[in-house]
Amino acid sequence: MSRYTGPSWKQSRRYGISLSGSGKEIARRNYVPGQHGPNNRSKLSEYGLQLAEKQKLRFSYGLSERQFRNLYIAATKVKEGTVGFNFMTLLEQRLDNVVFRLGLATTRRQARQFVNHGHILVDGKRVDIPSFRVQPGQVISVREKSMKVPAILEAVEATKGRANFVSFDADKLEGTLVRLPERDEINPEINEALIVEFYNKMM
């Protein structure tokens, strides 16, 4: 299954989350596209609930099913902690996500583009792989030739607050993943246990 590249508002409304981060997609119509009103919801089966939760998280990070599943498999191989939380942590360690968390991009999709286009450095070296796993203490910065890219400067200006597990220097356009996040610091609307149940049945 390929990565979804259609309008983000459709998936935002379908799964009740804001993929843009602004919340505008679901502020006015908090029911799925195609429904004739907010009360016309069908009750999901157990499998349907698990699938919906999985899709909600997958679309939040903008991953293909293969990327998402492979990261889940990696989480099952981590010796400490629960599979669900380890999975959430690995998602957060993706370079495109850290770029987003630092406020260098307004969305994860935009962050992925910045990484792909070579605008981002990790410890001073250009990394153009969005799935690169950032470790605590590593410095994420904008390469010198990209420091005046309007979209990056606009994103930094628009960012009002950042997660407690990252630090950012707006003057240098660089930041650090200070530590791995705690569970209550990321995606509180997600029930990762449903995702674990989904993959346990499928694998």
UniProtKB/Swiss-Prot annotation:
Keywords: Ribonucleoprotein, Ribosomal protein, RNA-binding, rRNA-binding
Family annotation (CDD domains): S4 (cd00165)
GO BP term (any one): translation
The S4 RNA-binding domain, residue ranges: 93-156
Recorded GO CC terms: small ribosomal subunit
Signal peptide: none
GO molecular-function term, one example from the UniProt record: structural constituent of ribosome
Family: Belongs to the universal ribosomal protein uS4 family.
NCBIfam families according to UniProt: PRK05327.1, rpsD_bact
Subunit structure: Part of the 30S ribosomal subunit. Contacts protein S5. The interaction surface between S4 and S5 is involved in control of translational fidelity.
Primary role: One of the primary rRNA binding proteins, it binds directly to 16S rRNA where it nucleates assembly of the body of the 30S subunit. With S5 and S12 plays an important role in translational accuracy.
Record's protein name: Small ribosomal subunit protein uS4
